């Protein structure tokens, strides 16, 4: 009888230890913000980081759609009922969702992923976008591990955007010059040493592209210089205010370098903050 009691007690202790480990893991889950202007390569870096670290990538536009799909007016709190109409309206007319609503939904969905053992950490892609959103993050006591800022000059940003084409189905962007090199190679044409080197550098991003994907790639309608200039100016004005709130945890990355070099810089920041 004493032996049975001891075995049960042992199982109970193990169970408690496992629960404590789970709680500790959730408490230690790192949250990084990846900041940068349009064309700085945030999406590309997020895909690479997601694969290496098994992190959940949070993008606000996708988060709002996800929230709308997961919930309905019957299963949310009363104060959230008007969120659906607001999100629906903004999705239709292209306007911005109210900052307070964005933060409320962001906080709710963020907690879901913090408590999900499937992910080792979280990377927030390109959010907050303005000072008000950044301030709300601080006021809601959302603990950010590091604010990683990809710094790229205006001329480089415009060159990248001008050479950017996207997959309209996945919304993944690619470099048009590299796509042309891939097409040239598949057509059996001889590549220059420079073109061969470019394919080797970016092979991990482009080697699985099917011919169907290559054919449907297209330019974004808003990738025009006038639109870019306006967005860049707004970004610069917001960045200075946002960075002031995260100055103690801000780490700058040289975004003028290659994709792999930028990735190594970001990985170094993450690896300096182990769980």
Curated annotation (Swiss-Prot):
Phenotype when changing residue 43 to G: Loss of catalytic activity
Gene this chain is encoded by: AK2
CDD domains (alphabetical): ADK (cd01428)
Organism for this UniProt entry: Plasmodium falciparum (isolate 3D7)
Phenotype upon changing residue 4 to A: Partial mislocalization to the cytoplasm with some localization to the cell membrane. Mislocalizes to the cytoplasm
Effect of residue 125 to D: 36% decrease in catalytic activity
Keyword Kinase annotated: yes
Assigned keywords, A-Z: ATP-binding, Kinase, Lipoprotein, Membrane, Myristate, Nucleotide-binding, Palmitate, Transferase
Function: Catalyzes the reversible transfer of the terminal phosphate group between ATP and AMP. Has very low activity with CTP, GTP, ITP and UTP and no activity with GMP, UMP or IMP in vitro.
Sequence segments annotated as region (Required for cell membrane translocation but dispensable for cell membrane localization): 21-30
A Pfam family recorded for this sequence: ADK
Enzyme class: transferase
Source domain of life: Eukaryota
Family: Belongs to the adenylate kinase family.
Activity vs pH: Optimum pH is 8.
GO MF entry, a single one: adenylate kinase activity
Name of the protein in question: Adenylate kinase 2
One GO location term (cellular component): membrane
